[in-house]
Amino acid sequence: MKAPLLSAVLALILGQAALPAAELATDFPKPPPPLELAPRMGRPFNDNAVFQQQMPIPVWGWTLAGAEVQVSLGQQQRTAKAGADGRFDVKFDALPADKLKSVDDAPVGRTLTVVTSFDGKRETKTFSSILIGEVWLCSGQSNMAVRYNSKGTNLDPKRPALRFLEDDWKVSAADTCGRCYGVSYVFGHKLQGELLVPVGLMNAAVAGTGIEGWWYVAPGDPPTPTKYQNYMPKIEPLVGHAMRGALWYQGEANVKQGKDYLPMLKKLIDGWRGAWKQGDFAFLIVQLSTIGESATDKPEGGDGRAAIRNAQMEALTAIPNTGMAVTIDIGEKREHPQNKYDVGLRLAAWALNKTYDKKDVVPSGPLYKAQMIEGGAIRVKFDHAQHGLMLAKKEGLAPPVPTPDAPMPWLSIQAKDGSWHWADGKIDGSDLIVSSKDVSEPVAVRYAYTIHPAGCNLYNKDGLPASPFSTCGY
């Protein structure tokens, strides 16, 4: 490989540049082995790290090829020998979580010590305050990467056992919490409060990125213009660090591919799960919210983000162990809605119910389940509406307030001849009955199936919004 091309590829690894398609003609190069004996650790390993409880704990790094390596974590010790590329790997036995007496508890943690030796020389690195708890990967594009803003949230930032990783692990405090992603911070804050164990958040998002750049890159895969751009610098350095699951807030860059997004999302999830070799770990998606101007003259909808929201909801049944936070009620005209607080809480609700088996937590708002034609009306049934449906209005970060006499916007019904008409909705316990004076033989229903359905007001009585839906697919 010519030197300029090698430099460009290495720049790509570091996230500094994207290669022109014409230059993507060779396999991804392996870095040369380290020239120093001092151990260089994988990205997840430094002071204040959080390791996943109840799973074997892999630790890896690089040193001189052939060097002897001793690694200890608390009372456990392992040995290894660096390979020809300088890499060494060890694995510790699974450990229980460090239980917290309260959310502001500050466990001492364990020490991770790495000793490398070669030709009579010896180097040691020590990392302190290593905690055992719950670890989540938080990825996507700019709406995931928006930093935490404490305004109006009333979240106490002093959480010594809540930590987040970018270049290194940081401990949650008043002067650090604003450097964490907003969605992931609220998610982790809520989890820790409910579980009373340490929580570690591995943040890895890049603004403006399509899903293709995040797909798993297998060793020896031929490069393409989309590969390596995000997966290699952001995800690959984390692969193997045991974790409970992943959060995914992305889709804005793929809205024109809404009808194809489900297989694209499946490729992402399957690739990451295969890389981690942990089975079907939890994968929680943020459904896209509103943006732009409302399109009130098209009852059939289908414009803008309608298809990709539909694909995100279909993932719940098409891909095992996936979840979704609905955000249709907290969007804005802008690309980046300010309210990341409710997004984090809704992701946490799904995780608490499904991943941590806390059945007293309602995981989601109403999700379309089935329709039944009843004369000139259609009865729509939902999952997660067992306590009933309601109409409500949400303002800012406050819980939605019931508005039982309000009209229900963004409902449309399809006639037997294929035409679409605006419709009325009537709540009947946990069902929604939809009809229109212009349609005597209805066949399908759509709700909020457009780019910016402002004022969506259908919730379950637990205060979580209904997802947009189409009973006839795309």
Give each language-model segment a name.
Residues M1-L5:
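Positively charged n-region of N-terminal signal peptides that target proteins for export
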Residues S7-A17:
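Bacterial N-terminal signal peptides
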Residues A22-Y474:
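Cell-envelope and extracellular/periplasmic
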